[in-house]
Amino acid sequence: MRDLDRERDYNQHAKGPEHMIINGQVVKVSDMVVHRFRMGDVEDPVLYAAQPIHAWQQTEAGKFVMEHAMESPWWVRHMDPYDYGYQFAIVARMKESDQTFYTLKYVGTTN
């Protein structure tokens, strides 16, 4: 999983929606935030973020994303202005059909 430490890095990496031909069909592919978590003000946030990221990857939702992502998912770190800590987001580039499945099955659940 790649790490992008700043908003600028994310914007340079992020791509707009694309259309690709996969198995003879035109498929729309775009970025989707698949998981978010917050962390307090710690000395090394990247080191402390490894455990929640790994734990999420072991869930059913995390395994689905790792299997269906078009390229390796990445995480982005932002400052959290409310508690002076950090916000992390995991972003994956997936087909529109996989995004719909993910949203219906996993968004709003504890998994």
Language model: regions and residue ranges:
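Short, compact, well-ordered microdomains
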Residues: D80-N111
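Structured alpha/beta or helical-core interaction and ligand-binding surfaces enriched in interleaved
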Residues: R2-D83
